[in-house]
Design a protein with these regions (language model features):
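Conserved N-terminal segment of class I S-adenosyl-L-methionine
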Residues: 1-186, 196-199, 264-265, 289-298, ...
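A short glycine-rich, Lys/Arg-flanked "PGG" loop and its adjoining helix->strand segment in the class I
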Residues: 196-213
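Short conserved AdoMet
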Residues: 122, 193, 207
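Feature marks short, surface-exposed loop/turn motifs that line or immediately flank catalytic pockets
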Residues: 158, 219-222, 266-268
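Short, glycine-/aromatic-enriched active-site segment of Class I SAM-dependent methyltransferases
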Residues: 212-241, 246-252, 277
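Short N-terminal helix/helix-N-cap motif within the alpha/beta-hydrolase-1
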Residues: 193-197, 224
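A short His-aromatic
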Residues: 187-191
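Substrate-binding/catalytic lobe of Class I Rossmann-like enzymes that use SAM or dcSAM, i.e.
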Residues: 245-281
């Protein structure tokens, strides 16, 4: 599945290897545009990266794009639901609270929120979410009692000010000021053209002892090896860099960070999404499992099997996405 279209000399933007690297032709499949984009996989650090950045990325982030589409306030309109979510999400982020722990067993918190429980946070911690879209995760945190938080995303139409006080600002991380205890990238880092410059900004903004959390798809995975250019999380052309474990370590070292921990948190999406792409079914198709499960090519037994396989791959450090916890040296 991973036979390259050709080999071509390119300069790796991560490790600076100027060599002949395998090149892959990858189609846009979220919206079924089927445009082809060329990626190369560095022979040294193994980072898979787009060869040429498209001049206009706006057409690949239309209205209704995943991270912009949800108004998180709709989850908090019923008093009972609001209370349950607040208690659950406080436990999800901090890992503390018996009642929240009990609720979480029956009503699990989102994985991106639970990723924070490995960091020593308090509700007074200053948290910056970069590339947060409409700010759904931050909204959950704000409702759970975290008030020193800010979201930034250059792709939103305008600044967002929610009724509860949360602000999401239309800006780049390089424009942010102040100091922060946690700076996090939940599936946004792979969309950024200059990851080293981004980490340089993070380094300036982090408080001593602060943490940078990067949650991304990883090419060091079974899904890439098995599905190749049909791997759903390749997501051309929106994902500019699909990091390997080595390439992210190299990038971190360049800005004097070290990776303190890695947690694999992939799910069944890596299988049903990639199987759809193999069969020419886009993510937004009427036949897509995400749009219409009953009309998809999968039954529930298959989805359950995909889920179990994903959990095993995570245990084996072979899942197709992971959370990296970076600290300054």
């Amino acid at each position: 599945m991973n036979s390259p279209a050709e080999t071509r000399k390119n300069l790796c933007r991560i490790c600076d290897s100027n060599d002949y690297h395998p090149v892959y032709r990858v189609r846009e499949m979220m919206y079924g545009l089927s445009e082809e984009f060329l990626y190369f996989k560095c022979v040294q650090c193994e980072c898979l990266q787009i060869i040429k950045f498209p001049e206009d990325m706006s057409r690949y982030y239309p209205k209704g794009y995943l991270s912009f589409a949800t108004d998180p306030s709709c989850f908090y309109r019923k008093p009972i639901e609001r209370w349950v979510r607040r208690v659950r999400d406080s436990y999800g982020a901090l890992g503390k609270g018996f009642l929240g722990q009990w609720i979480e067993k029956f009503y699990p918190a989102p994985e991106d929120l639970k990723a924070l429980s490995r960091i020593s946070l308090t509700k007074q911690s200053k948290i910056l979410d970069v590339g947060c879209g409409a700010g759904t995760l931050l909204y959950l945190l704000y409702e759970a009692g975290f008030s020193n938080i800010l979201g930034v995303d250059p792709h939103i139409d305008r600044d967002i000010e929610y009724e509860n006080g949360l602000v999401v600002s239309r800006q780049e991380v390089q424009e942010v000021t102040g100091s922060w205890d946690l700076i996090m990238f939940h599936h946004s880092f792979e969309h950024m053209q200059e990851p080293l410059k981004v980490l340089q900004s993070v380094s300036k903004l982090l408080n001593p002892g602060g943490c940078c959390l990067i949650r991304i798809p990883v090419v060091s995975s079974f899904a890439w090896e098995d599905y190749g250019v049909h791997w759903v999380q390749l997501d051309a052309p929106r994902h500019f860099f699909l990091h390997s474990l080595d390439s992210l370590r190299i990038l971190a070292r360049k800005e004097k960070f070290h990776i303190e921990d890695i947690v694999f948190d992939s799910d069944e999406f890596q299988f049903w999404g990639s199987e759809q792409y193999k069969n020419g079914i886009s993510l937004r198709s009427e036949k897509s499992y995400s749009m219409n499960p009953a009309q998809s090519i999968f039954n529930q037994e298959q989805i359950d099997r995909f889920r179990r396989k994903a959990m095993q791959l995570n245990r084996d450090a072979r899942g197709d996405q992971a959370v990296f916890y970076l600290k300054k040296n």
